[in-house]
Amino acid sequence: MLIFTAPGQGAQSPGFLSPWLELPDLAEQVGAWSELAGRDLIALGTTGSAAEITDTSVAQPLLVAAALAVAGLLGEPDAAAGHSVGELAAGAIAGVLSPSDAIRLTRIRGEAMAEATAAEPTGMAAVLGGDQAAVLAAIAAAGLAAANINGAGQIVAGGTLTKLEAFAASPPAGARVRPLRVAGAFHTPHMAPAVEALAAAATGTVVKDPAITLLSNADGAVVTSGRYWGERIVAQVAAPVRWDLCMETMSDIGVTALIELAPGGTLTGLAKRALPGVELLALKTPDQLDAARELIAAHAASTNGYAAVPVGVPAEWRIVVAPGGGTFRSGGKEGEAGAVAAGATVRAGAVLGHVVQRGGERPVTASHDAVLTEWLVEDGDPVGEGQPLVRLEPEEQA
């Protein structure tokens, strides 16, 4: 199973787009998106200075345009995920919204977030190392917010520059603090005004349910509703990015290869530690396109509806996820016996349980003949859309 990931702000560097624009039709496509972005993305991605492309209103559409342009050169992945603004690129790759709408919303997002940063000098800093619980407690005690939790040993704090400086001067035990090249405290309450602006802009945007598995920064869940994804993408501006949970879900759903779209490097660096055994490729130049296509050919599988189950490729186990939020009820129809026991054989289409919602119940079904190896929730547990519920192992491997 292969996933495309799209990096977030901070991944850009001067001139990173130059080699890509030498490819046929790519400059024309980026030029068209420049009109939607209200900025000359070609000039900014080739000759823009570090200071120019650090500007939030510039960096965000530039990164989304780059990710979408490069994704268009490759085949369709099985799954997609984006870090921060990269979520908009991932949404377009998954077919939730058009690339043009992704660029349009990114422009509004970037401009609104830039405006929010002007209210008070804020920033972000990476906290490297230390005990995670102790680091999170220290961030809160310093009056800062944990804006990104990127995995073991890397948490990003956001807040006022004054508080960040004080925090860096007295870091948590075993940790070091490194300022980031960003213009404000993104994914913190400082961005609340930007949430309102993006919500207004998103109203009326045509969205569809994802055509492939799509992960959410909010909690790593697989999102199966385009409408719900839209709500999450708006709220996420002022909420933490849980990339650690996204990588946990990648492991749970059986990802075997990860391609980070240009400008690659940041997310593959995190995956090296969190996803051992997964083949990784960070796309930096067009010279790597053949390697990317080979990786896709070797690892791509289809996905099967809301269950986010890779099929067509042998796997040690597969995950069935919740089709929506609600309360999990094991068993078949109401009044029937409870959970299918671990070790039992289930047939394709068998009802394993239901998610009870206000408007009724949504069945959770087996997508293929398999052995149920482990329940990940219990009867009566509250569940969120995309939450892993049960592990299934193909019969031939049981």
What are these language model-derived features?
Residues 279-303:
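Short, flexible loop segments at boundaries between secondary-structure elements
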Residues 305-354, 361-363, 369, 398:
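Acidic, low-complexity mobile loops and tails
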Residues 1-134, 180, 257-286:
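FabD-like malonyl-/acyl-CoA
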